[in-house]
UniProtKB/Swiss-Prot annotation:
HAMAP family: UPF0173
Protein's name in the database: UPF0173 metal-dependent hydrolase Minf_0129
Keyword presence, RNA-binding: no
Family matches, as PANTHER family: UPF0173 METAL-DEPENDENT HYDROLASE MJ1163, UPF0173 METAL-DEPENDENT HYDROLASE MJ1163-RELATED
Organism for this UniProt entry: Methylacidiphilum infernorum (isolate V4) (Methylokorus infernorum (strain V4))
Keywords, in A-Z order: Hydrolase
Length: 226
């Protein structure tokens, strides 16, 4: 597996011969590279919840590439009304199987509404399970006890956790989440994009190091091989 970071909570995952794109937010992200909007070619697009900073570029990328979009029932229904027919609805506790493995849609503790104010269903996260390893993407979430169950059900190789605080967990809560998940390493997401979620990088790294948790902060367009 190989992770490509595109800023905020947007990242790509190479798994098997497939490329998955999560929570596309590029054109409105001042820290991302706008050329990515025309160069990314995912086979699948995964959306954790309906907030603009996770869904803003899903439609243009899906229309250009014809990539199916996986998300909860309400979001996929809304996307169909926007003219996208290639949707794969899911909901909490459900999973779908693919050539590269299995995708589970799991709980997150967060709100969800769509850019036009429509109801966005319940926010979620994703666990991607394949022969190359297991990735947990928390989406936007608070610390929650369900993470202990995720760690019991899956041997998580890497957890992508929000660390910016204010709207999600901060660094301290992400450390507690990592212990609950019993994951092998953590990659931080959902930080620095806006003033309210800026973090001290060195302080965050030290806090994870003090807890003996391998931790990565990637720059935009930087990659991580698992």
């Amino acid at each position: 597996m190989k992770i490509h970071y595109y800023g905020h909570s947007c990242f790509g995952l190479e798994i098997g011969s497939s490329f998955l794109l999560f929570d596309p937010f590029i054109s409105q992200n001042p820290l991302s590279d706008p050329t990515l909007l025309d160069t990314l070619n995912p086979q699948y697009i995964l959306i954790s919840h309906g907030h603009f900073d996770h869904i803003a570029d899903a439609s243009p990328i899906a229309k250009r590439t014809q990539a199916p979009i996986l998300s909860n029932f309400e979001i996929t229904l809304w996307l169909e009304k926007q003219g996208l027919s290639q949707v794969l609805p899911m909901n909490l506790g459900g999973n779908r199987s693919f050539d590269f493995g299995k995708i589970h849609y799991v709980q997150a503790a967060h709100s969800s509404s769509l850019p036009d104010g429509s109801y966005g269903g319940t926010a979620g996260g994703f666990i991607v399970e394949g022969p190359e390893g297991i990735l947990y993407y928390a989406g936007d979430t608070a610390l929650m006890s369900d993470m202990k169950l995720f760690g019991e059900c899956f041997q998580i190789d890497i957890a992508l956790l929000p660390i910016g605080g204010t709207f999600t967990m901060g660094v301290d809560e992400a450390i507690r989440a990592a212990h609950l998940l019993n994951c092998k390493q953590v990659m931080g997401v959902h930080f620095d994009t806006f003033e309210a979620i800026k973090i001290d990088h060195e302080e965050a790294k030290k806090k994870f190091q003090d807890e003996e948790i391998p931790f990565r902060l990637l720059k935009v367009k930087e990659s991580l091989i698992l």
